[in-house]
């Protein structure tokens, strides 16, 4: 049975985890890191770079490097590189492919199934796009689950008490969520984790804190040199990297230095930046971002109808929660209660996803997870009103139906427009899709009965059905938002991703063949040089000719030619080595003959023949 993994597909970093003997383990990537930067780069030679290696080359390849694409998931955003358009799903799929590859390398077997996490406040289009990214990467997405829910799953299973409330404060690289969950455990150790309420902001995260530092540095350069660097892509990339590093350093230090030499050129010469940024300055310039975390927190407490004193545990999730100001605001919101710092904020979500994967695959049978839909779902009715069929924070999966009628006499069809959100007017909410139910029998307005059914599956993805009770005609659709990919698009992208995987494998094999060939040249030349006086001339000439041909092949790019010439050098070297040892053996035999004739030679005595260098004794037999 193929293994299932849990994946935290993050804005800035991603993590993959797997159950080993029923317990979750975070898998280190090929570079040795436990988190993989969610960065994809397209090298000019056609190679696709993912993770740390893509992040490191961003300064010199900025136009061909994509980062923080999670913020664009579920939208019509795309980027064009080498005349090819890439969607957020395709870029995300590259990251997922790397995580899949690293997991397979660690496990030594194929990985086909995955549970992928998304921010709790992701809408339907964003969830659908994430699922599509998994499919493009060659994964069977068992479930899409909310990040705070996964974190609570990882944290809550360790708790022994019944009916505890856990608040998860999740501030990542690009998104923010607050969720309140109830964790119960019965006498048999079976855990039930139920989401009580969730809220958030899909465009609030560590990237925004970084941008404030970048803006601050741009002003400093402008006032010192009178130039605007915001259009200088390379300078902006260097500023972004320095801003991110400064943010991290200010989590432990009260001030940090930012030094960027030769950042750009001005009329008066090179532009250098040497700045000191204090934690107080940093917190002042980002205070409004911090304030934006407060409303979702209060919304969750209100929706769940609980008192702050009822909350047993507070879990911080996401690398951005390491900032002291964030920890401070959480403590302030909780009336002085200290958040729990016993979990790794970068890894806890992936660990929860791996646990859920284990539940779905039958590896863990001691937990039930009940999630909720983060936003209300409804349709537009007369007057542009948003008529809700499923309210936010409803447990999923769920199914709701309601009967509507026509607005005009003899109306032959109705247009079903589906929206997601909390506003009273449909136009102020997120449009998810539109479809038409036709063939309604002629009748006065108000007479036909059209039953509209909303069905939200365990992934939080919406399915809608409309049925005319009079004629029995019905129309269905799976809502997938404006960014949705057709089945043909997904299949094409899957093939494209597989092709790139094969190309990457071929490149690795070519690089290995080249490395082995270069090593073979070095070893062979060293062997010939070290043993020149002991080697036959004809054998030396053959090896040197083979090495020369291999060097010529290495100057080119034909991997098959390099391998063939390497084999020729190896064979010639083996022959030469055999000839050298044969010559030494002959010389040794002649020496033995001379020694036997000499006066000092004595035959071994009978006792000498019985001498052995060492003997293994089995003590057990003697006992």
UniProtKB/Swiss-Prot annotation:
Low complexity: compositionally biased ranges: 583-598
Residue ranges of the TM segments: none
GO MF annotation terms: ATP binding; ATP-dependent protein folding chaperone; unfolded protein binding
Biased composition (Basic and acidic residues): 496-515
Chain residue ranges for the region called Disordered: 496-524, 583-623
Keywords, alphabetical: ATP-binding, Chaperone, Nucleotide-binding, Phosphoprotein, Stress response
Induction note: By stress conditions e.g. heat shock.
Compositionally biased intervals (Acidic residues): 607-623
Phosphothreonine modified-residue sites: 175
InterPro entries assigned to the protein according to its UniProt record, in alphabetical order: ATPase_NBD, Chaperone_DnaK, Heat_shock_70_CS, HSP70_C_sf, HSP70_peptide-bd_sf, Hsp_70_fam
Taxonomic superkingdom: Bacteria
Function: Acts as a chaperone.
HAMAP family found in the cross-reference section: DnaK (MF_00332)
Stored NCBIfam families: PRK00290.1 (NF001413), prok_dnaK (TIGR02350)
Family of this protein: Belongs to the heat shock protein 70 family.
Descriptive protein name: Chaperone protein DnaK
Organism: Kineococcus radiotolerans (strain ATCC BAA-149 / DSM 14245 / SRS30216)
Gene: dnaK
């Amino acid at each position: 049975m193929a293994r299932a993994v849990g994946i935290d597909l993050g804005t800035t970093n991603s993590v993959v985890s797997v159950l080993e003997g029923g317990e979750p383990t975070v898998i280190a990537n090929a570079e040795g890191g436990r988190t993989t930067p969610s960065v994809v780069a397209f090298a000019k030679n056609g190679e696709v770079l993912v993770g740390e290696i893509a992040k490191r080359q961003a300064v010199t390849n900025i136009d061909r490097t994509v980062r923080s694409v999670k913020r664009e998931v579920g939208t019509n955003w795309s980027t064009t590189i080498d005349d090819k358009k890439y969607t957020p799903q395709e870029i995300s799929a590259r990251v997922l492919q790397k995580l899949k590859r690293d997991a397979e390398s660690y496990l030594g077997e194929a990985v086909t199934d995955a549970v992928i996490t998304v921010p709790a406040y992701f809408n339907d289009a964003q969830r659908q796009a994430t699922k599509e990214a998994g499919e493009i990467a060659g994964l069977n997405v068992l479930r899409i689950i909310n990040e705070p829910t996964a974190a609570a799953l990882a944290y809550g299973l360790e708790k022994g008490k019944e009916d505890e409330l856990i608040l998860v404060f999740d501030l990542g690289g690009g998104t923010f969520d607050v969720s309140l969950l109830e964790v119960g455990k019965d006498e048999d150790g079976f855990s039930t984790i139920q989401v009580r309420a969730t809220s958030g902001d899909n465009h609030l995260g560590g990237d925004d804190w970084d941008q404030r530092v970048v803006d601050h540095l741009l002003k400093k350069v402008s006032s010192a040199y009178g130039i605007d660097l915001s259009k200088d892509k390379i300078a902006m990339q260097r500023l972004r990297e320095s801003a991110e590093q400064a943010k991290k350093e200010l989590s432990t230090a009260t001030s940090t230095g930012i030094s960027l030499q030769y950042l750009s050129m001005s009329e008066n010469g090179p532009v250098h930046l040497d700045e000191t940024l204090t934690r107080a300055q940093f917190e002042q310039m980002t205070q409004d971002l911090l304030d934006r975390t407060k409303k979702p927190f209060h919304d969750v407490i209100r929706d769940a109808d609980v008192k702050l004193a009822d909350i047993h545990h507070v879990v911080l999730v996401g690398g951005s929660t390491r900032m002291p100001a964030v920890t401070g605001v959480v403590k302030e919101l909780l009336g002085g209660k200290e958040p729990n710092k016993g979990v790794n904020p970068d890894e806890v979500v992936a660990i929860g996803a791996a646990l859920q994967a284990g539940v779905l695959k039958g590896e863990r049978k001691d937990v039930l997870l009940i999630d909720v839909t983060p936003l209300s779902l409804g349709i537009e009715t007369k007057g542009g009103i948003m008529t809700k069929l499923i309210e936010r924070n409803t447990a999923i999966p769920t199914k709701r139906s309601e009967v509507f009628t026509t607005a005009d006499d003899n109306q032959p069809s109705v247009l079903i427009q589906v929206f997601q959100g909390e506003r009273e007017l449909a136009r102020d909410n997120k449009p998810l899709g539109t479809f038409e139910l036709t063939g309604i029998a002629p009748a006065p307005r108000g007479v036909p009965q059209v039953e509209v059914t909303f069905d939200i599956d365990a992934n939080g993805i919406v399915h809608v059905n409309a049925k005319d009770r009079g004629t029995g005609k019905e129309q269905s659709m799976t809502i997938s938002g404006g960014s949705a990919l057709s089945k043909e698009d997904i299949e094409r992208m899957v093939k494209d991703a597989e092709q790139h995987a094969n190309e990457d494998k071929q490149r690795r094999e070519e690089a290995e063949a080249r490395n082995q060939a270069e090593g073979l040249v070095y070893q062979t030349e060293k062997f010939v040089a070290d043993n020149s006086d002991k080697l036959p001339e004809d054998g030396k000439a053959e090896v040197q000719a083979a090495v020369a041909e291999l060097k010529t092949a290495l100057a080119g790019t034909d991997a098959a030619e390099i391998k063939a010439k390497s084999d020729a050098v190896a064979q010639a070297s083996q022959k030469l080595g055999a000839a050298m040892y044969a010559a030494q053996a002959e010389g040794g035999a002649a020496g033995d003959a001379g020694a036997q004739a000499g006066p000092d030679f004595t035959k071994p005595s009978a006792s000498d023949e019985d001498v052995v260098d060492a003997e293994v004794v089995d003590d057990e037999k003697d006992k």
